[in-house]
């Protein structure tokens, strides 16, 4: 992405269907890695204690069933993102800025969990677009060199995708 008019470029990208199966192939690998991280992390008490504020309910061994006990998009996104990052080793994207595309998983999943009338391809498309936005931004500018935290790109990518989903 060029540095000019990023808002328009992101809007146009989100409004355009993905044309290449390469997008989905890469996203599939990242999704599988993310699922593995979430499932393994959920077996550790210290992760669950950190990820879930409300300790009044008993946790299921399947972390995706625990999502149903959370009260908001934010709680679902936080829970899944903490579980993802606890064991997230394999999806580091190296460019001018490093990134972990799987950091977008929690926010995108929270939308589709609350809106189950979509198909899995809609979920993978949204997640792939978040990955692409974050990766494209990382190719252009190193935030760390400017004194900012690289997770801003996650916030921007996840926020853009989530906002576009809300308009559907």
Segments and roles (model prediction):
Residues 1-168:
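N-terminal core-entry segment
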């Amino acid at each position: 992405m060029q540095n000019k008019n990023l808002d328009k470029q992101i809007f146009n990208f989100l409004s355009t269907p993905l044309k290449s199966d390469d997008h989905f192939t890469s996203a599939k690998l990242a999704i599988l890695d993310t699922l593995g991280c979430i499932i393994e992390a959920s077996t550790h008490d210290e992760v669950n204690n950190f990820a879930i504020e409300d300790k009044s309910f008993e946790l299921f061994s399947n972390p995706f069933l625990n999502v149903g006990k959370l009260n908001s998009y934010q709680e679902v996104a936080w829970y899944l993102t903490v579980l993802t990052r606890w064991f997230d080793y394999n999806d580091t994207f190296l460019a001018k800025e490093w990134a972990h595309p799987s950091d977008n998983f929690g926010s995108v999943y929270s939308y589709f969990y609350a809106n189950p009338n979509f198909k899995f391809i809609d979920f993978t498309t949204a997640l792939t677009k978040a990955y692409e936005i974050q990766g494209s931004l990382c190719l252009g500018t190193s935030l760390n060199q400017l004194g900012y935290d690289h997770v801003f790109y996650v916030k921007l990518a996840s926020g853009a995708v989530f906002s576009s989903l809300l308009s559907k």
